[in-house]
């Protein structure tokens, strides 16, 4: 706004500070009864303008007026608004036609009755300075809503006493006593001020909770009309709630956690719950989402537990420890999935009775470093440990029969993820698809496969990312190795030994070839490195560490000559030792000249 264009102009009984389009200030002559608004826009700030014109009783809005924003206290005694503008309506209040928005109720007196059927939306400070304490029509229109949290600030409606810790205006909670221990909510609420009850809230209609934007630590349920457990999940999902107490026959509550009346199903743990949770004996099922996003650190299952629902512990970012007990045999029964996705485990030990780990059961556990699978485990479903970048060592038990697609794959955006080692004595069905993934990769991660079974000892280095066709063929060959007769004449062994040739891009291929020879010392990889020294060196510089470059050039068959392109890459990585080595190339340096 350029104040140089503004000036005072007199219109009738008033003067307006305006640039001809927008008015930002008003002065009214003493004893003036009427003020006419003639400019397109009126925008007078309630904080900077404290003027009061108590003599004015009528406001006239001319045809070309588009918007009016003025302090409600400026004209405390207005009784009538006359509008020739299509943007406002005639009446006792200043109401915008679009949306039927109440801008100003004006002063009114204590005995005045505000008719809430005249508008559908209440703007901020619409009742500031309004002395009226009575209202009609609050429940007659389902369209009525409060648009601003300061709508009733400074109004006579707030002069009423607190009842049950709240002040209500029909279906609107306009104030909350934040000092009392308990708040009692009415059954029907359409709006609540953004204040938080200090300790506890008592609820007779669970649907009202959706209007309470700041919940206390404890919620008491007294809604006998509840017929769906989902209502608890969706209405009580606030991180502020630490304890739930049930006063209805449908539920029992222990330590703030909700169970079915027969204590066979754990239905909901409040998200604010912390510390250790010991689930009581007799509980058979944990319902879907029951612990999702809670703050618990440890959970102990009873021996009676049989089933864990979808995403039951999803996103428990502080859950570090779990005791499975001796009862549950399948984590992810009946298609349930993502039960523990996104938790904070560093180590998981599965007891011997666990036979199956379900789909995505422990995916996205970024802190997970160690998993102990006991004998008895038969099936690991697809994506069970997907995107666990710190899970680098997998030892599968001899009892394993099948591993699902992408069970141990990392396909996230981190580029420098260490290689994963997988050790097996029994080859489960689908192992190839469980550890490789179709598509490109971020970085050069590999899987080192060690098989020690009755057919012999085999070591392969597989690229994590391959084409769909290559992944399928790799899987078939690994599956065939489970057949004793076939394994002894397996022509596909060479295919696995040269798996680097099937990496998803050329740079990846050279890096995997280096890793293959370093790990398995096979002849094919040696010949490949010998024929592609420069490409391999460049791949190592771009994707790996300086020590890898040193190890590569120390291979007794490698004779990497000075190359400007390689020198440039080394300079960009600031690998000073490797750069010095290349610059000294050809000067008769000893074989072990490069030390990192």
Predicted regions and their residues:
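Structural signature of tandem-repeat unit edges
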Residues: 1-123, 128-146, 153-170, 176-285, ...
């Amino acid at each position: 706004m350029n104040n140089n264009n503004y000036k005072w102009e007199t219109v009738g009984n008033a003067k307006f500070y305006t640039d001809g389009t927008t008015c930002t200030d008003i002065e009214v002559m003493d004893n003036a009864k009427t003020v006419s608004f003639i400019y397109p826009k009126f925008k007078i700030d309630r904080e900077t303008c404290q003027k009061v014109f108590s003599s004015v009783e009528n406001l006239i809005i001319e045809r070309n007026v588009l918007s009016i924003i003025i302090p409600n206290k400026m004209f405390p005694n207005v009784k009538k608004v006359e509008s020739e503008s299509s943007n406002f309506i005639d009446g006792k209040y200043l109401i915008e036609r679009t949306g039927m928005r109440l801008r100003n109720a004006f002063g009114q007196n204590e005995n005045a009755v505000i008719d809430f059927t005249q508008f559908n939306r209440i703007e901020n400070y619409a009742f500031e300075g309004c002395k009226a304490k009575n209202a009609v029509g609050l429940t007659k229109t389902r369209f009525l809503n409060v648009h601003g949290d300061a709508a009733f600030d400074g109004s006579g409606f707030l002069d009423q006493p607190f009842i049950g810790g709240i002040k209500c205006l029909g279906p609107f909670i306009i104030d909350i006593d934040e000092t009392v221990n308990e708040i009692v909510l009415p059954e029907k609420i359409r709006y609540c001020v953004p204040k938080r009850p200090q300790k506890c809230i008592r609820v007779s209609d669970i649907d009202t909770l959706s209007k309470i934007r700041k919940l206390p630590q404890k919620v008491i349920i007294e809604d006998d009309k509840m017929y769906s457990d989902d209502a608890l999940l969706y209405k009580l999902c606030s991180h502020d709630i630490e304890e739930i107490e049930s006063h209805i026959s449908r539920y029992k509550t222990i330590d703030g956690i909700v169970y079915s009346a027969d204590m066979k199903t754990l239905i909901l743990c409040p998200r604010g719950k912390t510390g250790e949770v010991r689930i009581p004996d007799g509980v058979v099922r944990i319902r879907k989402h029951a612990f999702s996003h809670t703050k618990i650190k440890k959970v102990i299952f009873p021996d009676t537990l049989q089933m864990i629902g979808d995403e039951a512990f999803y996103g428990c970012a502080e859950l570090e420890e779990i005791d499975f007990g001796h009862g549950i045999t399948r984590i992810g029964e009946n298609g349930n999935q993502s039960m523990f996705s996104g938790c904070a485990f560093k180590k998981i030990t599965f007891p011997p009775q666990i036979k199956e780990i379900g789909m995505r059961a422990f995916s996205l556990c970024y802190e997970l470093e160690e998993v102990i699978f006991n004998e008895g485990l038969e099936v690991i479903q697809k994506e069970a440990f997907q995107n666990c970048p710190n899970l680098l060592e997998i030892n599968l038990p001899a009892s394993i029969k099948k591993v699902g697609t992408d069970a141990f794959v990392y396909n996230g955006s981190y580029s420098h993820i260490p290689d994963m080692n997988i050790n097996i004595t029994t080859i489960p069905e689908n192992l190839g698809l469980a550890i490789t993934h179709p598509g490109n990769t971020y970085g050069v991660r590999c899987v080192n496969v060690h098989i020690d079974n009755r057919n012999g000892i085999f070591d392969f280095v597989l690229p994590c990312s391959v084409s769909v066709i290559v992944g399928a063929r790799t899987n078939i060959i690994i599956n065939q190795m489970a057949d004793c007769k076939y394994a002894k004449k397996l022509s596909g062994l060479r295919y696995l030994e040269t798996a680097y040739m099937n990496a998803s891009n050329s740079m990846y291929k050279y890096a995997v070839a280096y890793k293959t020879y370093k790990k398995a010392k096979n002849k094919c990889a040696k010949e490949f490195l010998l024929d592609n020294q420069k490409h391999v060196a460049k791949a190592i510089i771009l994707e790996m560490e300086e020590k890898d470059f040193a190890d590569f050039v120390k291979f007794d068959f490698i004779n990497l000559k000075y190359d400007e392109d390689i020198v440039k890459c080394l300079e960009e990585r600031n690998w000073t030792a490797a750069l010095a080595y290349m610059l000294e190339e050809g000067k008769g340096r000893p074989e072990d000249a490069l030390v990192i």
